[in-house]
Amino acid sequence: MPRVKGGPVTRRRRKKVLKLAKGYFGAKHALYRVANQQVMKSLMYAYRDRRQRKRDFRKLWIARINAAARQNGLSYSRLMHGLKLAGVEVNRKMLADLAVNDQAAFAQLADLAKANLNK
């Protein structure tokens, strides 16, 4: 049986993998088999972490809102409940931005939440 040489399709596939592995350390950027394993693992990490990033940002926003809420005499949960009772539909991303960049506006929202909690 004759030996099968790597044709254009195989070469193209291997070049594509090695291109994705560019910048990896050691053999992982140069040897096809090791590079292929690392590229597969990297793609799995990328898929997982695209979902994780959404959770991480939500945690960050909540931490920022909680810190600002406590400066205004409320806990995070009471602030959110008060805003919901007031009919304010501001998402966590916008609230966190207000907490960092416009503390006066955040304080007004906190006062509104306090007023609606006491009703």
From Swiss-Prot:
Pfam family, one: Ribosomal_L20
Top-level taxon of the source organism: Bacteria
Cystine pairings recorded for this chain: none
Entry GO CC: ribonucleoprotein complex; ribosome
Keyword entries, A-Z: Ribonucleoprotein, Ribosomal protein, RNA-binding, rRNA-binding
SUPFAM superfamilies per UniProt: Ribosomal protein L20 (SSF74731)
Membrane spanning residue stretches: none
InterPro entries xref list: Ribosomal_bL20, RIBOSOMAL_L20_CS, Ribosomal_protein_bL20_C
Span of the signal peptide: none
GO biological process: ribosomal large subunit assembly; translation
PANTHER family, A to Z: 39S RIBOSOMAL PROTEIN L20
Annotated HAMAP family: Ribosomal_bL20 (MF_00382)
Similarity comment text for this entry: Belongs to the bacterial ribosomal protein bL20 family.
Function: Binds directly to 23S ribosomal RNA and is necessary for the in vitro assembly process of the 50S ribosomal subunit. It is not involved in the protein synthesizing functions of that subunit.
Protein name per Swiss-Prot or TrEMBL: Large ribosomal subunit protein bL20
Organism: Geobacillus thermodenitrificans (strain NG80-2)
